[in-house]
Design a protein with these regions (language model features):
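Catalytic cores of the polymerase beta-like nucleotidyltransferase superfamily
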Residues: 1-170
C-alpha cells in the first residue's frame, strides 16, 4: 500500500473509532477501481469540521464553510469533508451555502457517477448509490442528475467531462 493511501486509511480508522462514518471519496476511488494509483486521497465523513479539528492535532481550516478541513498526516495533506448538500451556485464554481447531510445526499451533489463512489478501506466495501462502478466497467462518463444543471453549477465540469471521456476512450 502506498504511503498516501496508508495515511488516508489511518485517518478514516481514527474517524470511525470516534463513532463517525468515513470513506475514501471521489476520484481516488475511481482511479483504484481502474487499477491506477491515485494522485491524492479525499475523505468524506459524517464528522463536522469542529469534530475533525478536535480529533486530529494537525489541521488547517481552509474550507470550513463548505465542511472541508485539511488533516496533516505523515507530512501529507488530506481533504476531509463533511457529507453535504450544496445550495445554489453563485459564481459558476462555488455553492452559496451548504447543509451537512448523509452519504447518499452527498453523492447526489457530485458531478459524475464514476466520481460518486465511496470506499470504506476498513470493511473493504464500496458504497455506490449511482451505479458508478458499472459505468467504470462500461467506460461511460455520466452526470449525476441533470447534466445541464451539473454543468451550469460548476463551469469546470465540462472540462472535467472532456478529460474523463478522453481517458475512458483511449486505447490500451
Amino acid at each position: 500500500m502506498d504511503s498516501n493511501k496508508a495515511a488516508a486509511v489511518e485517518i478514516i480508522g481514527k474517524l470511525q473509532e470516534e463513532g463517525h462514518v468515513a470513506y475514501l471519496a471521489g476520484g481516488c476511488v475511481r482511479d483504484m477501481l481502474r487499477g491506477e494509483t491515485p494522485k491524492d486521497y479525499d475523505i468524506a465523513t459524517s464528522a463536522l469540521p469542529e469534530q475533525i479539528t478536535s480529533i486530529f492535532s494537525k489541521t488547517r481550516e481552509v474550507g470550513v464553510h463548505f465542511g472541508v478541513v485539511i488533516v496533516i498526516k505523515d507530512n501529507q495533506a488530506f481533504d476531509v469533508a463533511t457529507f453535504r448538500n450544496d445550495g445554489s451556485y453563485k459564481d459558476g464554481r462555488h455553492p452559496e451555502d451548504v447543509t451537512f447531510s448523509t452519504p447518499e445526499e452527498d453523492t447526489a451533489r457530485r458531478d459524475f457517477t464514476i466520481n460518486g463512489i465511496f470506499f470504506d478501506p476498513i470493511s473493504q466495501k464500496h458504497i455506490d448509490f449511482v451505479d458508478g462502478r458499472s459505468d467504470i466497467e462500461k467506460k461511460v462518463v455520466r452526470a449525476i442528475g441533470d447534466p445541464d444543471l451539473r454543468f451550469q453549477e460548476d463551469h469546470l465540469r465540462p472540462v472535467s467531462y472532456t478529460h474523463l471521456r478522453a481517458h475512458e476512450t483511449r486505447e490500451d
